[in-house]
Swiss-Prot record:
This is Uncharacterized transmembrane protein DDB_G0287441. Keywords: Membrane, Transmembrane, Transmembrane helix. The chain crosses the membrane at residues 159-179, 203-223, 234-254, 267-287, 296-316. One of its GO terms (cellular component) is membrane. Signal peptide: none annotated. It is found in: Membrane. The keyword Metal-binding does not apply. It comes from the Eukaryota. It is a multi-pass membrane protein.
Amino acid sequence: MMDPYATTHRRLKQIQGHFMTPQSLRVLPQFTLNSLNNKSNISSMWRKLTTSSRIGAVSIPPLTAYYIFKLFKGKHRKFINDKDIEIIIKEISGNDIFDQVVKLASKVIGFLGVIQISNRMETHLGVKLTFSKSYQLLVTLSSILDTILSFTKLTQKWGIIFCIVSILYCIINIRMLYLTLAHNKTVERLLSVTRTKCQGFKMNIPALGAWGSVVAITFYIWLKEAKKLAQSTGGILTMTAFLLSAIAAIRVGLRAAMTSFPGLTPFEGSSAVVIAIILGALPLIPYYTTSEWSRTLLSGYLSIVISMIINSFFAWKTPSML
């Protein structure tokens, strides 16, 4: 018969090994929570960001101001009446060189973050429930669809570059899905008896309230625009890929708020994904008033960003023994 204490102890070591450096495993100190003041917390988070994430984070405020300025400057821009989703998405995504650079930067930052997540996953394969299987499955499917779409855009400006990045994303996501499904299956079954002792189960009311408010706003906008959106044609792969990634992120945010435990870690990787999503969504802002699709996508990105911020917050906090 398995010793419950030994199993729980091993589980705690696995969790701590995932969140800490390999060197800390030799000492195995007691779990503590990051409970400093707000200024110290922000400073601690900033130090844990990768260099690319810091550059992206610093760029967000001026870029947001720039795109909001473009929104007001072009408020009399003609409304987009085209019914083809692919044409609409191309029109509202920003087509000048600066927009392309911003989108490419978001892809690169996100990719570097995903590599962080993948490397940590491979190092600590036995960390049960640290990575959400449903999230990884949905994101992988979305990545595959994005890659297929990128091949249809090779003739466009920057098409080859974005295609290469999409392929790299797809490969790393498939690898992570394999690690999540194949390697963790046996360990999950072995350690299932310790789930309530080692996984967070305390609901975080502020996080849940923020998540619920933003998701409610998103669904309100989607329902409000549903009639116009239904008149659009084509773009099935594009919207399916977006919805899969949105559902994955929103679910991770809900799970983190309900359990006070992240569904996507480490913080360095999760925060990079948040920054990448924000940067990628910014070029849509100037077209908020000219297309229902811009409003739909931006509201969706809002829910994704808030959900991932909630997840990243709990990924930053050191897990505690419950």
